Design a protein with these regions (language model features):
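Carboxylate- and glycine-rich phosphate/diphosphate-binding segment that chelates Mg2+/Mn2+
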Residues: 1-67
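Short glycine/serine- and small hydrophobic-enriched flexible loop segments
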Residues: 7, 79, 98-106
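Residue-level recognition of alpha-helical structural elements
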Residues: 35-39, 62, 86-89, 111-114
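Active-site His/Glu-centered metal-binding helix of metallohydrolases
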Residues: 69, 73-77
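Residue-level signal for inorganic ion chemistry
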Residues: 71, 97, 166
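Catalytic Zn2+-binding segment of zinc metalloproteases
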Residues: 76-85
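Small-residue-rich helix-loop
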Residues: 90-99
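C-terminal charged capping/lid subdomain of soluble metabolic enzymes
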Residues: 109-191
Length: 191
């Protein structure tokens, strides 16, 4: 259920603040499958958001790229773990979104208040927030090397979708960082 919830949460964070606030209220029942009606409603809303995006940009040339929020980091995390069961895709996406949220704040795009609200939701649902739980500092190069292989990168820079606020992302290709910048940022998790 965690993997599915990662995608539901992602859709709320990138395009629908009201949906995110609804998830704050109902997320625990959804993730624990305590209320089937809420689960169905969340899946329906999530699919509707994704469908709207895909229909507007079938070739993934612009808007559809926002669906990659958290995934560039996630692919780096999965690759660094050799795509093993130690970190499944949903967990990697949850962790990737948290790292992207922290970077959004560091780049002064996303307020501390919004970051706190998102992290509180993660904590209430016992979702992954700690990169150090899965990776040692010496694995950062491996993570970034996998991130560099992403097909959406431009001009030898890692293309990222970040949050400006809950329900709104940066424009596709607005944030493209050199691998050294990503390494420096990831190193900041290890004092």
């Amino acid at each position: 259920m965690v993997s599915g919830y990662a995608e539901i949460l992602k859709h709320s964070l990138i395009l629908d603040r009201k949906f995110f606030l609804w998830l704050i209220k109902n997320g625990k029942k959804i993730i624990n499958e305590k209320n089937k009606a809420l689960l169905i409603n969340a899946i329906f809303k999530s699919c509707k958001i994704k469908s709207t995006v895909v229909c507007k940009d079938e070739k993934e040339r612009n808007l559809r790229m926002i669906l990659n929020f958290g995934h560039t980091f996630a692919h780096g995390f999965e690759g660094a773990k050799n795509f093993s069961k130690k970190l499944n895709h949903g967990e990697a996406v949850l962790l990737g979104m948290i790292v992207a949220i922290d970077l959004s704040n560091k780049k002064k795009l996303l307020s501390f208040k919004e970051v706190s609200l998102i992290k509180k939701h993660y904590k209430n649902l016992k979702l992954l927030t700690n990169i150090k739980k899965f990776f040692k500092k010496n694995e950062i190069n491996k993570i970034v090397n996998f991130m560099k292989k992403d097909k959406k990168n431009v001009s030898n820079k890692i293309n990222l979708i970040l949050l400006k606020k809950i329900g709104q992302t940066t424009k596709p290709e607005q944030i493209a960082l050199k691998d050294i910048e990503i390494k420096k940022f990831l190193n900041s998790y290890y004092p």
